[in-house]
Design a protein with these regions (language model features):
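PLP-dependent amino-acid enzyme catalytic core
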Residues: 1-328
Length: 328
């Protein structure tokens, strides 16, 4: 099993920069997780680095995961596993078979893609894992989107990077916004804040007033909040009852636009605006949709003069899918 030196050395903090465009009556900053130097970057690369450690430790010879044809997670896991020199098997819903850039990359990395109806995903995963074991293989399964404690831990580190930037730059963010899909990113950010606030209280300092807002790209609020809360509980373990504050979990489904992958002309306009003003590519499924939702949320809640950080969670290949659709 080959090493990936970036993951062996550890991922360096990603840059935070003030945005140039006029996006409303607040000061907007962006954390460029898309600049992590592996497979087009993104928070999925940060999560993959955590799964990499477990895979190396367990002597795995095949990695399984789940995701759609547009999945950034599947692209990065397929790339990571190819770099390690072991097999990758992806379960994907047959309902989404348009050949996107992420689809092509997954194929180029040599992953086997097995499709099934979305209603049969769970059973297909179980059967395939058992088939690998019966064949004498040592499979390792990663939940869709990098869901689970390794992924949450990766995003706790994201929060710590943000806190370190605030201290170094002499700035305090009032809000953090990001795209919320499987919920792991938000679980990590909120867990990081809860742990940091507990340390401050122990030192007699006030907790941070920062609000973390997950902009749902698919799930309704009830389901989305519960998945994030459960991930926080799983990660904090015995400290959950002591640390968790329900008001810290802000999840909005007001900008889902009908579900996963759905978007409006206003989202497309936002993506074009950000590219022209700041030179930053976004996409219609995750980041561009969430950035648009952030601006609408800020206007609806009367936010003015605030320091707002948006986390660019990656997905550059999807930007080129967007360009192709715009040129049809």
């Amino acid at each position: 099993m080959r090493q990936i030196m970036l993951f062996e050395q550890g991922i360096s903090p990603t840059p935070i920069v003030k945005m140039s465009g006029g996006y409303g009556e607040n000061q907007y900053y962006i954390k460029r997780e898309d600049m992590i130097p592996f497979s087009f970057g993104g928070n999925k690369a940060r999560k993959a680095a955590e799964f990499y450690k477990e895979i190396r430790a367990c002597g795995v010879d095949v990695v399984m995961t789940y995701g759609s044809n547009s999945s950034n997670h599947c692209r990065i896991i397929a790339n990571m596993v190819a770099s390690m020199g072991i097999a990758c098997h992806i379960i994907s819903p047959e309902e989404n078979r348009e050949r996107l850039y992420n689809t092509r990359l997954v194929e180029d990395f040599g992953a086997t893609v097995e499709t099934c109806p979305v209603t049969e995903v769970s059973g297909t995963i179980d059967r395939r894992m058992e088939a690998f074991r019966q064949a004498g293989r040592n499979p390792y399964f990663i939940m869709g989107g990098g869901h689970g404690n390794p992924g949450t831990r990766a995003c706790v580190n994201t929060y710590r990077e943000i806190a370190a930037y605030e201290e170094q730059a002499g700035i305090s963010f009032d809000y953090i916004f990001h795209a919320s899909g499987t919920g792991t990113t938000q679980a990590g950010l909120v867990s990081g804040k809860l742990l940091a606030d507990a340390e401050k209280r122990e030192k007699g300092k006030p907790a941070d007033g920062l609000k973390i807002v997950g902009v749902s790209i698919a799930r309704n609020e009830e389901r989305g909040r519960e998945v994030v809360r459960q991930s926080i509980e799983d990660y904090l373990g015995a400290r959950y009852a002591e640390l968790y504050r329900d008001e810290e979990l802000i999840f909005t489904d007001e900008y889902c636009m009908g579900g996963y992958g759905k978007y409006t002309p206003e989202v497309a306009q936002t993506i074009e605006e950000v590219m022209k003003s700041d030179g930053i590519p976004m996409d219609t499924t995750y980041v561009g949709k969430a950035f648009y939702g952030m601006r609408r949320y800020a206007a609806a809640h009367g936010l003015r003069g605030r320091n707002i950080l948006f986390i660019h969670t990656g997905g550059t290949p999807l930007y080129f899918d967007f360009l192709e659709r715009q040129n049809l």
